[in-house]
Swiss-Prot record:
HAMAP family: Trp_synth_beta
PANTHER family, per the entry: TRYPTOPHAN SYNTHASE, TRYPTOPHAN SYNTHASE-RELATED
PROSITE patterns with a match to the protein in the record: TRP_SYNTHASE_BETA
Gene: trpB
Name the UniProt record assigns to this protein: Tryptophan synthase beta chain
Subunit structure: Tetramer of two alpha and two beta chains.
Reactions mediated catalytically: (1S,2R)-1-C-(indol-3-yl)glycerol 3-phosphate + L-serine = D-glyceraldehyde 3-phosphate + L-tryptophan + H2O
CC per GO annotation: cytoplasm
Pfam families listed in its UniProt record: PALP
Cofactor list: pyridoxal 5'-phosphate
Lineage, opening ranks: Bacteria, Pseudomonadati, Pseudomonadota, Betaproteobacteria, Burkholderiales
């Protein structure tokens, strides 16, 4: 395979990515790009980033053999990359630390963020507290309802949480509001985007901060499993946890990459969030990618039991990986993800986030069809405490 060097200088992954924003944001993006291109090569910045990941986040996160579950399934060996063990409970904090350090380097005292499941909001509020920054988090009011405990966590950390009432009142609407705030307060504000979407340099910047996940796996799997995996499986909403584990494996051609989208109530139901499976190429939130849209190009409302996958677009690098055939993308329904959540709790004593449960469900589906010496590595991107209410509600339990 020829060396992988995307995006190009204009931020394109083939036809995807780029910069599609209002003129008022061009200067801010140019400034951000210059700062990032300086910092990513600056030994002092890299040293500080790595120090924070070790001492504040608790990295490296381990890889773990789900031996009992693998035995029960009677096929491939399932391994988990335990991002749920990070401080704040998910992969999101890796990227937030990187961007907060960048904000500090640029002299921006105020950070803003959008959040769906609340994990990125919590991670942003956490690093803002750590570095003494003002923090405002935009969150769809539907997600505020679904993720009440994370909303309270953000407030405890000193952040202002702004519920967004427009549209479907979910992640895309929160992103729209955050963009508006950024345009208005560009001089003193840094926008910490939580996923590998948005205008360049965000998709590559977020990817780069998250590749610590896959880089650790490259070292850990030979030590703990004896070799690299045959399959790497990760859930895809915007796609940052998946890019973080996929990117270092792209040159390893014998490792198959499988992204798992939210098929909701089924792809035929129209109630899902599988942009790569069912979307068309369009422009959303500053970049060209696959978007869930109707015949008139209007963004469609999405659905997933998991707030973090409930997004009508996907990172442009995933769009490129799909078209190039380097990664394959599949859908897992709400019911399949919930079943995997319950089984993971019962069999392995690990409570995964509903986002991660989609990836686990795919691994569980694949394992019995594969030989016993096959290795499937799943990015267990976060823990499931935040999803207690959703899971209990689905089971008809009130608390």
């Amino acid at each position: 395979m020829k060396p992988y060097d995307l995006p190009d200088a204009q931020g394109h992954f083939g036809q995807y990515g780029g910069v599609f924003v209002a003129e008022t944001l061009i200067h801010a993006l140019d400034e951000l790009r210059a700062a990032y291109d300086h910092c990513r090569l600056d030994p002092k910045f890299i040293e500080t980033f790595n120090y924070e990941l070790k001492h504040f986040v608790g990295r490296p996160s381990p890889v773990y053999h789900a031996a009992r579950w693998s035995r029960e399934l009677g096929g491939a060996q399932i391994w988990f990359k335990r991002e749920d063990l990070n401080h704040t409970g998910a992969h999101k904090v890796n990227n937030c630390i990187g961007q907060a350090l960048l904000a500090r380097h640029m002299g921006k005292p105020r950070v803003i963020a959008e959040t769906g499941a609340g994990q990125h909001g919590v991670a942003t509020a956490t690093v803002a507290a750590r570095y003494g920054m003002e923090c405002v988090v935009y969150m769809g009011s539907e997600d505020v309802r679904r993720q009440a405990s994370n909303v309270y966590r953000m407030k405890l950390l000193g952040a202002t949480v702004v519920p967004v009432e427009s549209g479907s009142r979910t992640l895309k609407d929160a992103l729209n509001e955050a963009m508006r705030d950024w345009v208005t307060n560009i001089e003193n504000t840094f926008y910490i985007i939580g996923t590998v979407a948005g205008p360049d340099p965000y998709p590559r910047m977020v990817r780069d901060f998250q590749t610590v996940i896959g880089n650790e796996c490259l070292e850990q799997m030979p030590q703990d499993a004896g070799r690299q995996p045959d399959y790497v499986v990760a859930s895809v909403g915007g796609g940052s946890n998946a890019m973080g584990i996929f990117y270092p494996y792209i040159p390893h051609e014998n490792v198959r990459l499988i992204g798992v989208e939210a098929a909701g109530e089924g792809l035929d139901s129209g109630r899902h969030a599988a942009s790569l499976a069912a979307g068309q190429v369009g422009v959303l939130h500053g970049n060209r990618t696959y978007v869930m849209q109707n015949a008139d190009g209007q963004v469609q409302e999405t659905h997933s039991v998991s707030a973090g996958l409930d997004y009508p677009g996907v990172g442009p690098e995933h769009a490129w990986l799909k078209d190039s055939g380097r990664a394959q993308y599949v859908g897992i329904t709400d019911d399949e993800a919930l079943a995997a959540f319950h089984d993971c709790c019962r069999i392995e004593g690990i409570m995964p986030a509903l986002e991660s449960s989609h990836a686990i469900a795919q691994a569980v589906k694949m394992a019995p069809t594969l030989p016993k010496d096959t290795i499937i590595l799943v990015n267990l991107s976060g823990r499931g405490d935040k999803d207690m209410h959703t899971v209990a509600e689905r089971a008809g339990i009130q608390f």
